[in-house]
């Protein structure tokens, strides 16, 4: 069946209709789109009926065409269904978009559209009329009046059209100005928005950078603090381990006692010479380490506050004494050692360097003590109205506390306390003396240095720090004995030999007993006699004469079976008393 041809009215309607074309791919004439509704409200069927209304067709032809259409239409069996909600919403939104004010046009008449052409033609007519007027200036008056009237009418019409055109142009200019101003406002708003967003991004980036720098600084500070604490703990452990050496040194006898022992032979003075050389080398190492640390600590400060190490150390560095062989050389060597020239030189260097570092040391102590001290506690104490807050030793600077402790006879009293040997051990007395520590408890000795008070304070501080660290890690409270053993043993614990796989009955636990001595269990295989023979033996032992025994044996032999003949023959062969063969 050929497709239906559209009329001129339907084609014109498609040009004036802004709605999209509804295309049905399953329609018989799918290659030609069908247009549903036009802008004027008429449909395709109405236009065709209007245009082809004069054509008359027979009823039979219509029926045949309908049957052919049903056969050719693949959707003939479909039921009529209303438009879905989705299509309605789509059409509604589309109509809303089309009805937007931006797409509205301006109504105008055909005269306004052709006003420009009419004005151009009218201007040419005016020129022609002027030329005619110049040619016919001597014409009749009636013609001039008619021409004047006609010109007036033309001028009125042209002026009215020109006013309408100007008004329309003014409206267009106003609309253009409004659109331009709105575009400018939108552009400025977008620019301000972009600028604000860029400013926010830059601000957030700067804040993130500052936070990152602060976080890195805090992390570095924490690492340095941890490193300092670890160094301090190692130094404290070294001091604790050196306490045993100091205790043994305090037990050395008086110089008058071991002078005779040292000068007796060269073999006795040789260890003293080696020990003195090693001590002097250790002193040089510690002194160089101290000067190095002072240089590193003052690297970031002003050079005026730096203290230089003594360049001329007057002590005898080259203490290299050979082991003497003769008695006179031994006495001279011991006299040189007992003069303490090398030790005095070392002490002078240490004391002079310490006195030079005292201002710097006091300044550093006060600075870091002020940073460590809690300012909140001081502010709270001041707010409570406590006038004696500054008099407390805790709230004072370390230099002030040291000065107050050493004021008056404080220094002499502390020095005298260190010259008393105080120890609870049994061997706390000096070698070569018979008195115990209880007898010499209050006796001062210039050759003794016992800082038990300071050592106890250091040990207590270390134990508290270790216990706090273990409790923070979840280990709970730790006894002092365990911590002391860890300090003395270097933190290594003795591992017991325990089989961990033998728990919960996974291995059989048993103990091997020792072998029995002088014990023999009964062996039944070695006994050849039966119960009758044993019973007969005991009857023989209990009988008073051999006749009774023979009579009893004769009766027993008669009562035995024939199967026991061999046994009875063996018994008869026994001439005398025989026990167990």
Swiss-Prot record:
Which regions are flagged for Basic and acidic residues bias? 94-103
Acidic residues composition-biased segments: 51-71, 126-156, 171-180
Keyword set, alphabetical order? Nucleus
Q: Write out the ranges of the annotated region (Disordered).
A: 19-196, 486-505
Q: Which GO cellular component terms are attached?
A: nucleolus
Protein location: Nucleus, Nucleolus
Pfam family membership, one:
TRAUB
Which GO BP terms apply? maturation of SSU-rRNA from tricistronic rRNA transcript (SSU-rRNA, 5.8S rRNA, LSU-rRNA)
| Predominant subcellular localization, coarse grouping | nucleus
Question: Ranges of Low complexity compositional bias?
Answer: 41-50, 181-196
Q: Does the keyword Signal apply?
A: no
What family classification does the UniProt entry report for this protein? Answer: Belongs to the AATF family.
| Designated name of the protein | Protein BFR2
Species for this entry = Mycosarcoma maydis (Corn smut fungus)
Q: Give the gene name.
A: BFR2
